[in-house]
């Protein structure tokens, strides 16, 4: 049985800002967006969250909820440096590290000799070391599989950890809301609830063939996760291949003008996310994704060496006109595909 830890830094970007400027600690702050332009909140500290400010929230909405919110543009070099230090701490315990972003990662400590081989003690020691060396807090989840470790890391935030032992898994899953499974958004959860499916325990009673017929590949993922099945390894060779942002809509849209407005809102967040990795990697393609109300989806990409909003809008309009038919759209996404570092190096050498 594997021992997987998921580490998630608490309010990472905001925490770095508060560490470096203690005057910010007790006031509501958020990273991302500005009062002058449309954008989205990247991270908010806990004082801001008390007013309802959340990650990915439109800046205008955040300011309505918290008019005295302090908006910071973000210092990505500082965040990257802190992230590198955190990953150095991880490497003291295992070489099997799979970063998900600057502020979270999976660790496989199955064969780690540290802390008598106890994943619980390793997670606790890692969190304490992060605090001692960086004055930042982290939360952790410990479980036999990746998706449960990720869920667990969110159950005792901030600055805490939650352990799901192999013996705990059946009982934990029986009452686990389907909305907690990574990849199940609000709209999917609502559709499942309309079918009387609210928990993993409900899915356990379903026939796999029915789920496959109703939801396609997504149905198999639902069934496997509800059984506690997640055979994915912690992949230490994982490279960031793309950067994207998407929004699942509370109600389906049927007008192009609504889709265009969503793209206008998503684009600044895509710019922000790309800024984190762009200094190291080149863009190969950019594209759009539309998911329809029958759970089918389509992705359209263009070869394009730099981020370009007008091209994304043109691509989205073409996709909307050619692929939608009469179906409503329930998700809109933007993404860029990054050039493989080895190919990038070959191209540079060939110039």
From Swiss-Prot:
Q: How is the cofactor bound?
A: Binds 2 magnesium ions per subunit.
Recorded GO CC terms: cytosol
**Binding of Mg(2+), residues:** 8, 103
Reaction catalyzed:
DNA(n) + a 2'-deoxyribonucleoside 5'-triphosphate = DNA(n+1) + diphosphate
Give the GO molecular function terms. damaged DNA binding; DNA-directed DNA polymerase activity; magnesium ion binding
**Chief subcellular location:** cytoplasm
What Gene3D superfamilies does the database record attribute to this sequence?
Answer: 3.30.70.270, 3.40.1170.60, 5' to 3' exonuclease, C-terminal subdomain, DNA polymerase, Y-family, little finger domain
Q: What enzyme category does the UniProt record give?
A: transferase
Q: Where is the active site?
A: 104
Q: Which GO terms describe its biological process?
A: DNA-templated DNA replication; error-prone translesion synthesis; SOS response
One family from Pfam that matches here is: IMS_HHH_1
Subcellular localization is given as: Cytoplasm
Q: What is its EC number?
A: 2.7.7.7
The record's keywords, sorted A to Z, are: Cytoplasm, DNA damage, DNA repair, DNA replication, DNA-binding, DNA-directed DNA polymerase, Magnesium, Metal-binding, Mutator protein, Nucleotidyltransferase, Transferase
UmuC domain boundaries: 4-185
Its required cofactor(s), as named, are: Mg(2+)
SUBUNIT field: Monomer.
| Similarity section | Belongs to the DNA polymerase type-Y family.
Known role = Poorly processive, error-prone DNA polymerase involved in untargeted mutagenesis. Copies undamaged DNA at stalled replication forks, which arise in vivo from mismatched or misaligned primer ends. These misaligned primers can be extended by PolIV. Exhibits no 3'-5' exonuclease (proofreading) activity. May be involved in translesional synthesis, in conjunction with the beta clamp from PolIII.
Name of the protein this chain belongs to: DNA polymerase IV
UniProt lineage = Bacteria, Pseudomonadati, Pseudomonadota, Gammaproteobacteria, Enterobacterales
């Amino acid at each position: 049985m594997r021992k997987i830890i998921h580490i998630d830094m608490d309010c990472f970007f905001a925490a770095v800002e508060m560490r470096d400027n203690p005057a910010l600690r007790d006031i509501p702050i958020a990273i991302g967006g500005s009062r002058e332009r449309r954008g989205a909140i990247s991270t908010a500290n806990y004082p801001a969250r008390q007013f309802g400010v959340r990650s990915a929230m439109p800046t205008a909405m955040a300011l309505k909820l918290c008019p005295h919110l302090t908006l910071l543009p973000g210092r990505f070099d500082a965040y990257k440096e802190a992230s590198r230090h955190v990953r150095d701490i991880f490497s003291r315990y295992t070489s099997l590290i799979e970063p998900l972003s600057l502020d979270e990662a999976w660790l496989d400590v199955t064969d780690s000799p540290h802390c008598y081989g106890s994943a619980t003690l390793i997670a606790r020691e890692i969190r304490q070391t992060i605090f001692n060396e960086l004055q930042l807090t982290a939360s952790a989840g410990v479980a036999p599989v990746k998706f449960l470790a990720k869920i667990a890391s969110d159950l005792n935030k901030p600055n805490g950890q939650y352990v799901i032992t192999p013996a705990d898994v059946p009982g934990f899953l029986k009452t686990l809301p389907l909305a907690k499974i990574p990849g199940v958004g609000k709209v999917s959860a609502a559709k499942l609830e309309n079918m009387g499916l609210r928990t993993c325990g409900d899915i356990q009673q379903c026939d796999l063939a029915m789920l496959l017929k109703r939801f396609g590949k997504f149905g198999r993922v639902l069934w496997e996760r509800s059984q506690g099945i997640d055979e994915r390894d912690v992949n230490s060779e994982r490279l960031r291949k793309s950067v994207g942002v998407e929004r699942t809509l509370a109600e389906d849209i049927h007008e192009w003008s609504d889709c265009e407005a969503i793209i206008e809102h998503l684009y600044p967040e895509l710019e922000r996310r790309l800024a984190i990795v762009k200094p190291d990697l080149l863009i190969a393609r950019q594209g759009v994704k539309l998911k329809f109300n029958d759970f089918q989806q389509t992705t359209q990409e263009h070869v394009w060496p730099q981020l370009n909003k007008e091209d994304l809008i043109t691509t989205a309009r073409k996709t909307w006109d050619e692929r939608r038919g009469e179906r409503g759209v329930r998700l809109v996404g933007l993404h860029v595909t990054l050039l493989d570092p080895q190919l990038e190096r070959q191209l540079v050498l060939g110039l």
